[in-house]
Amino acid sequence: MPRIDLEAIEQVNRTGYPPPFNEQVQGRWYRRLAPAAGLTDFGVSHVVLKPGAWSSQRHWHNGEDEFLVMLEGEAVLVEDAGRTILRAGECAAWPKGSTNGHHLCNESDEDCTFVVMSGGTNTGGGYSDIDLAFTAEGTFVHRDGTPYPKTERPA
């Protein structure tokens, strides 16, 4: 199995979220590992959350499973049922089609690092707490389907 050199993969903090929903993820830095490794059936990202940053808005995927492994530090997992601290070595999973909106918040004074994997068919999804959804085409829309203005989107 080929070793992946993280330092050789660009680390970015881009987001496609329309304002003001982009503000909470400004301290989220990620590397897209799947494209760099030639993987095409599922996504893998190495993510660093700076103190105070969110991994995303609280969301779910209609057609994609997600699996997360916390590598370093800790973050608060926020889901419909409440808040749970995830520490290094702990995992979380969300099956496709579950509308249990989730995200991580780094409420500590140190960076936290995790790897998240997703697989399935991108058929869109939604956001629990805000007037936002995403389509299979990768665009953001209001819950009523009205598009948001186009913003920067990660490659």
How would you describe each model-predicted region?
Residues 65, 72-74, 81, 99, ...:
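A generic structural motif
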Residues 29-32, 45-61, 99:
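Conserved short histidine dyad/triad with adjacent acidic residue
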Residues 46-50, 61-77, 117-119:
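Short, conserved beta-strand element in jelly-roll/cupin
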Residues 1-41, 125-155:
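A short, N-terminal "cap"/entry segment at the start of jelly-roll beta-barrel domains
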Residues 38, 96-123:
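Ligand-binding loop in jelly-roll beta-barrel domains
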Residues 80-96:
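Short acidic-glycine-tyrosine-enriched beta hairpin
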